[in-house]
Structures are given as structure tokens and as C-alpha cells.
Amino acid sequence: MRRIENRYNGEVNRYFLCDRGRFGYGYVNREDRPTQALERINDKHVKININYALDETIKRIKDKKIIGIGSPRASLETNFALKNLVGFENFSTGLNHQQQALVNKCIEVLSTEGIYNPGMTDIESHDAVLILGEDITQTSSRVALSIRQAAKNEAIKMAAATKTQSWLAEPVKRIAQGSQSPVYIIDVTQTKLEDISKVSVVATPEDITKLGFKVADEIAKFADDLAKIVDPQTVEKDADTGMDAMQALAQQIAYDLIQANKPLVVSGSSLSSI
């Protein structure tokens, strides 16, 4: 195999084959790749055809107590196929209780009415992003790419004001002069998105949680009178408010999220905390 051409899908991955951005086909050409079903007979591997292999497998597991153990490393389709094969009662996700609780919480959030969960294409249209406790460059690289695109929206907006088309990359870059839509990253380690972030902070899971609640409180305060919203950075220049660094950061994040046309908060389960 020398080349793969993917059909364009504007609603899902566009030209990407994998939503995690990790598709590869190099293994297809490996000399040691299994291409033939084998059966071990008298300590020797004997080649068998696929129909015989399937029939023999069914015959051997029929009327026996079989369990299926899935894996978060396997694809959704593979886990689903295994679950169908062994039955709901005989299937394990391969997760421990804490990990399963996290997955259940994610499912609950995704299925809750009133909570907007944008697709990867939608993420690109947001103009302010807060990432809390999730290194998406490692857990969902396609989402990370969408965040990179979202960071360019301020430049596109500035270019549009001068009637410059967004696809003119160099003119848009010159007009923006480095301006980007605000992206805040709060994580337990530095991430590969730091280069596009307005602020990137390394903190403990406990402090990340505290900051998240403080941002929510500040947004609630701003919502009391949107007409009086003032950039916290401007206030800090005029007077020493005496507030701690976390509170000041929470105010700045809340301000940028409220001022944005389409703010977005991204989180995940990699810190194993609900």
C-alpha cells in the first residue's frame, strides 16, 4: 500500500481518518504482519482459511462460560463487537471502579440536556477557550488541533475588518501582529499548546478545582451587571487590589469568557478525579 485518499466529511473529521489523529497504515506493509489464520496442531502452526477459523472458534466456545474483557485502548467498534459476542452480562470494560465511575460521569454529562457538547469542527469557531486539567494533545489530538484553529479567530476577525479573506494566510498574519483569541491552559504539567496560550499554569488537581469554582463565581458576579464589566488587567494597572494570584487569574478568565461570542470550557478524565 502506497497511498490512502480519504473522503472529505465536513461534519466530522474533514480529511482526517481518525478522530484522535493517530491513524496510520505503515503496519500494512510490514513483513511480519499476520496475513493468514493459523491453528496450532502438535506444536506446529498450520495455515487455515478464515471460514474454518470462524467455525472452529464458535464450536470451541459454544456452551461454555465465556467472558469478554474489553480495553480503553481498543476502538469503540472492537469493544462493541466483543460485548455482542459474549453478551452484556459477561462483558467487562477492563476498567477499575474509579475509571468506570469517570466514564459514567462523562456519559452523564454528554447525555444531559442543556449542556452543549461541540464537535471538533464546531470547536474551531469558538473565540475564547479554558482548558481545565486535561492535556488534550495526549488524549485527543484532533481536539487540540481544533483549539489551535480557534486561537486564530481573533486574527481572522481583525482581517475581516479590513476586508481581507481568512484564507489569505500571510496578510491575515501581518494584520494580526501576533494577536490571538484567548486560550487558558490549567494543567498539572506543561502541554504542547503552551505556544498558543494567553496563560498556561501548572497546578495541583486541588488548585485546578478551586480555580474552576472561582471562575464560575466571577462569571456569576459579572452577570449581575454586564454593562459594568471592566477588564481586570486595566483595574490592576490603576490600583493595587490586594487580591491573590488565583483570584486575579479567575477574574481575567471570567472576563475573557464573558466577552467572547462563543466561549468554550474543555475538561476530561485523565486526572482520575470527579
What is each residue range found by the language model?
Residues 2-36, 149-150:
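Extended active-site and interfacial segments that coordinate phosphate-rich ligands
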Residues 35-274:
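Cofactor-pocket helix-loop regions in the catalytic cores of large enzyme subunits
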